Amino acid sequence: MIVLAGRNLAKMEAAKAELDELGVESYCCKTDIADRAQVQALADYAASLGDVTQVIHTSGVSPSDTATENIIRINAAGTVNMVEAFYPVLAEGGVMINFSSVAAYTMPQTDEWTQAFEAWNEPDFYERLLVLAGEAEDEESEFFRAGLAYAMSKKFVIYFTQKNVARFAEKHCRILSISPGCYLTPMHQKLIDNQPETAENQLELIPAGLAAIVATVVVGFVGGPLAI
C-alpha cells in the first residue's frame, strides 16, 4: 500500500492510475509540506490505513521553480514538519528517507549556519535562514540568493537527518538522507530553459560525460548525463 502526497492532485492521480494498473493499492492526499497542520493530517491519515513502514520525503523546490522564501519554507521547514509528524507513527523497524542534494556540498557550513540550524525548533527558525540567504555577496541577484538558499536548505536536510539518527534508533527505526546529483526532471528542465549557462556549468561537473551516454545504451535507451 502506498500513500501519495503533494500539492498537485492531478499528478498524484496520474501516478495512482499507473500504480492501479500494476495492482498496487494506493491513495492520494493533497498536502502542502510547508503547512505543519496539513503534514500532521497526512501522517494521521497514513497511520489510519495501517502500519507506516517507509516514508520517502522527496518534496523540494529549486531556484528555477520559486523564490528564496519558498525554498527555505518548503525544503528546510518542510523537512522539520515531515520528520516531526511521522516520527510518532513510524512502525518499529521502519525507515524514513529524506532527499537532500549534491548542492549541499557546494557551500561550507559556517558557524552562522550551524547556529541557525540548531534553532530548528524556535519560532524564528525560518526568519534566521532567510536572513542568512539575504547576506549573499551579489545582493542584486535574486537567483544567486535563491541558489544560496537552496544549498543551505539541502545542507539542513542532512543536518536534521543526522540529528535524528539516535532518536529514531531508540524505537528501532532508521532515518537517512540521500543526495542526488544532476539528472533530468521537470524541475531541472526549467533550469536548462531559464538559466542555460548555470545548467551547462552543472553538466560540466558530471565526470562521466560521454560514458553516461554509453551507460544509457546499455540499459536500453539512449540519453545523456542528465538522464541517469
Language-model region placement:
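C-terminal helical subdomain
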Residues: 81, 149-150, 177, 197-228
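Conserved Rossmann-fold cofactor-binding substructure of NAD(P)-dependent oxidoreductases
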Residues: 34-51
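Rossmann-fold cofactor-recognition segment
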Residues: 19-37
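Short, flexible catalytic-loop segment of classical short-chain dehydrogenase/reductase
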Residues: 105, 180-190, 194, 199
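Hydrophobic positions on the long internal alpha-helix
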Residues: 42, 56, 82-90, 160-161
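Conserved glycine-rich Rossmann-like NAD(P)H-binding loop of the short-chain dehydrogenase/reductase
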Residues: 1-14
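Catalytic loop of short-chain dehydrogenase/reductase
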Residues: 61-65, 95-170, 182-184
